[in-house]
Structure formats: C-alpha cells, structure tokens
Amino acid sequence: MFSLSATDLSLKIREGEYTPSEVVEKHIDRIESWNPKINAVAEKMFDQARLRAQEATLRLEKLKQGKIQNAELPKFFGVPFTVKEMLGVEGCRRTGGSIHRRHDVVDFNATVVQRVIEAGAIPLCTTNVPELGFWVESDNPIYGRTNNPYDLKRTAGGSSGGEGALVGSGASSFGLGSDIGGSVRMPASFCGVFAHKPTWKSVPLSGHFPRTPEELRGVSSETYSLTTLGFLAKRAADLWPLLETIKGPDDFDPETKKDFVLQPLIQDFTNVRVFFLSDPQLFFCRRASAEVKETVKRAALGLQGRGAIVEELDSKIFKNAVEIWGAATSSQGQAPFAERLSLGGTIDYFSEFMRLLVRKSNYTFPGLVTALLEKLPNLGSNFEKALCELKDIDRILQSKLGTNGVIIMPVYPSVAPRHRAPYLAPFDFVFSGIFNALGYPATAIPMGLNSKGLPLGIQVAAGPFQDHLCLSLAVEMEKLFGGWVEPKLPE
C-alpha cells in the first residue's frame, strides 16, 4: 500500500482491494509510528479523517451495488494526504510557526486544499514549518524541530519540511506545500521524494499564510508574493494529476492566470534540449559536492541515452542569485520581516538571544538574525541592478529553452545537512530560489541513495507554463533511477 502512487492506490480502492477506512487507518498507524522520531505533525485530524473515510467506504458500497458508476468517483478517491501548516485547513491552527499566532484557528480551506478534497482525497494532519516559513530547517517555538526520516540527526528541510518528512517516511501519499525559495523542492530532495513548484501565478494563493482568501482579493500585481503553491509525492505518476487538480483561477486570487493549459506528458525525448549545470558557481554559496555533481551528470547522461540533446550551461549564469532572489522578493512590497516576526510589536534582541541560550526565547535563531540583517544599511543599493540582471537572465534562458528545453541542476549543494549546519551556509537555498525569482516551473526528482543511505536528487526547470516538460522528465527519471527508496523506521 505505502509503495503505491496515489493514483494507483485510488484505483485499488475502486476495485475493492482496499476500503478507504482501511487505507486511512493504515496511514494513521504509520504516522503514529514515525512521528515520535521525526516530529513532522503540527495538528492531527484523525477523527475527521476517519469520518470522511467512512463516508467514502459507504460510497464504495453503492458502487458495488451498482447504484453509482465508477466514473463518478473522483481521481484521488479515498487517498489520504497531508497539508503544510501555512495552508488553511478548516478548524485547524494556521500559525506559520509564530508564537504570536499560536492560537490562530481558521474557518476556511485554502483553495488548493479544497480542490484536493473535492478530488476525493482525505486530509490526515497539518505539518511542521520554520518560523514564518523562512528557513531551510523546519523548527519553531510551537512545534519544535522536524527530523529527516533517513537520518534523525539531519534536517528534513524547509519550509515544507514536515511534508518532506511525512511523505519521505511513506506516511502520506502526497502533501501540499508552498515554495518561495525551494520550500517544496529542498524537503523533497532531502527526504527522497518528488516535488513540483508550478509556474508562478498558475495556482491560486488563496488561504495561504498570513492572509485570508478575502484579503487576497485586494492584492495588486506589485505586492503579489513570489510564493507558489505546490506539492510533494512519493511517485512521479501523481505530479501531473495533482497540478491539473490545483491549477487555475478561483474567486479570490486576482493574479492567477486563466489561460494556463497543462499539456500532456511527453514520452519521446528526441526533441528535448537539456542544459545541465552540475557545478553552479554562485556568490555566497558553497560549491556542489562531488556526489551532487555526479548525480546531475548521471541524470543528463540518462536523458541523452533516451535521445535528448544535451549540453552544458554556463556555470556562472546564476552567479548573483543571492542578490537577485533578495531583490525579487523585496520588490513584492511586504511588511518588514521584524514586524511580521513580532506581529507589530518590538523585539528586545539582546534579551531574546540570551533566552535562546536556555531555549526560552519566543523566536528562533534564524528568525532573529533575519530581522537584524534587515536593519543593516545599503542592503538595497544593488536592488535595481539585480532586477535588471534577472530580466537579462530570463531573456537568455527563454531564448535557449523555448518550448522544448529544460535545465538540470542541483536542488542544494549537498545532501541533507546536519541540524543547524545551514547557519554556516545560509544562502545555499538559492540553488532553488533562483527559479522562484524567474517564475519558472521546477521539479525535484529523487536519484537514489548515497553510500551513507541519504537521498540524492536533482531539479529540472523549464520555461514559464512548460510544467509538463518537468513532469515528463520526472516520470522518465523514475524509470531510469528508481525514484523513492523507502526508509527504515529508526529504533
């Protein structure tokens, strides 16, 4: 059951091999086994999930009795899934990992959550995030720190780290997340699963932290977030149907594109141009490790063997990615980070850093440092220059990629780092974040395990609204390299 894709699991439910109640109960049991080790769950919805599963099981009985047709059952019928805590789930807290919002409970479902529920899936729980969703590790004063299912001493990533850990452990068929700087792709890569960040503005943000759906109606294009809602999954077969389910405009988000048509997956790669970048040279970032570089090259060779046209991309094309990502996110007109962190109050930085030493601070170390860095002068001096460079890179890449080109490169310069190690390399996330600045679709793809049993991975990016290319390569890479490898439950 746990090795199946969500679409195959739903098919087996329809065929009567499993009941929705049985599937939900098995996944709850697995969460209860894994969560004491990985601490991925924010809020459980097990009782509600059991009720939904009972209703689905009764519906399945009607199918057996011929009272309804198989075609009337939605695509993810009876399949359990999980949701990043920053997405609204009716009746659940949506705190963003902020101590000041620890009592916030929402009375709505985010649009993507509602669409997946309407597609037949059953939510089991919400999952852990960093403070305000702003760090590579999922750790906050409310829920604590999430661990990697392949090595508890390592991070599961952020900001959708709870999703990475639960999906990676096999306790969730798929999970909904969000991505502003690699936030679905890094957890997926660290935890050995797939993730897709769709093209910017192809999926409505309605219900994502901190706004309500109604508040999103008043957002202008100048203040619209670079955040894109996406998903993580154990199997590549689920990526295309998930995107087809959540994409498209709703009644709240004024910026979601109305004319995005998700094209079918391709199976012939002879016309695909692959630009690989195994060793990106980015200022303020580490170089890719030897095993990460080799993994990218292995993927490129695999596609070359399938007939794709492969060539190397300039290793310095993203050299200023840190400044570019910073300028792109700053141009969205958000409130200062310190104001969001304190919920409009003031922060006594000296006191809070002292309290951190005895683990009694209201904030995390990354949150306090980010708020302080924002106060430094001249950080915006190269703002316009960086935005101009972003436009130049976009122009160069779109001329190369067209409608049949992809980029293959690392998600992150190493496998999942040990806890707190990202403090020493805080900007490495821009290996992924550059595609948020560009607005391109990007997919994290697992590539097996290294000699220490840790997941290896790559990401594939394409031009705007060419998501199907990324998803097609994910399916092909899974065939070539095996995809998700189930971890063992730690003792």
Predicted regions and their residues:
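Amidase signature
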Residues: M1-A71, T245-V430, A437, F465, ...
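Gly/Ser-rich catalytic/binding loops embedded in alpha/beta enzyme cores
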Residues: M1-G181, L301, R306, S399
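Structural helix-boundary/capping segments
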Residues: S33, Q114, E118, G168-S278, ...
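Short glycine-enriched, charge-decorated loop/helix-capping segments at active-site entrances
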Residues: G96-R102, A421-A425, V460
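Short secondary-structure boundary segments
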Residues: T127-N128, S178, P410-Y412, M447-G448
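Glycine/Thr-rich phosphate-binding loops of Rossmann-like dinucleotide-binding domains
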Residues: F134, V184-R185, P213, F284-C285, ...
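Short low-complexity, flexible loop/linker segments enriched in glycine and/or proline
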Residues: S138-I142, S189-V193, V322-S330, L424-A425, ...
